[in-house]
Regions:
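Substrate-recognition element of Asp-dependent hydrolases with the DxDx(T/V) motif
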Residues: 2-29
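C-terminal cap/substrate-recognition subdomain and adjoining C-terminal extension
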Residues: 22-150
């Protein structure tokens, strides 16, 4: 949170979740009750539904390109632990390891993975077009092709 507060003039963090508003707001309000950091929140209804009934597959996919009229895709990053969310905008994807409470059982354990990503986020943010940097360093499109997801 400290990093986001300190860089508010250059970073606009937006919560984009496949969760429902009631649940999401309850959690985010605990860490940002005045909406000083996360001014915008996008929920399930902002996701695309991918469904294959014959195979019992149901997934909500986040697509930041649907906001290209109000956000510059050259400057937009989707940070997500699930590679499926990069299918519709692979050049904007920055993967990370999701938090798993089951792995952090004692009170002293902290999830500091995102804190460790601050240098990466700063470096990406310094790029005129984040997509070239992300492609060169993460190449999500090739990963998705290799996994036969594209």
């Amino acid at each position: 949170m400290k990093f986001l507060k300190e860089n508010k003039s250059t970073i606009e963090p937006i919560i984009y979740t496949s969760g429902i508003p009631a649940y999401t707001n309850m959690l985010i309000d605990l860490i940002d009750p005045k909406r000083e950091i996360f001014e915008h929140r996008l929920y399930q209804n902002a996701c695309y539904l991918f469904e294959k009934r014959d195979e019992d597959i149901f997934y909500m996919i986040k697509d930041i390109t649907r906001f290209k009229n109000v956000r510059d895709m050259n400057r937009s990053i989707l940070i997500d632990p699930n590679p499926l969310n990069f299918i519709l905008s692979p050049e904007n994807g920055l993967p990370f390891v999701g938090y798993n409470a089951e792995l952090h059982t004692s009170g002293s354990d902290k999830d500091e993975y995102l804190i460790g990503m601050t240098d990466i986020i700063k470096e990406v943010g310094e790029q005129k077009d984040v997509r070239g940097y992300l492609k060169e360093n993460y190449n999500i499109r090739q990963y998705l092709k290799n996994a036969k997801l594209m």
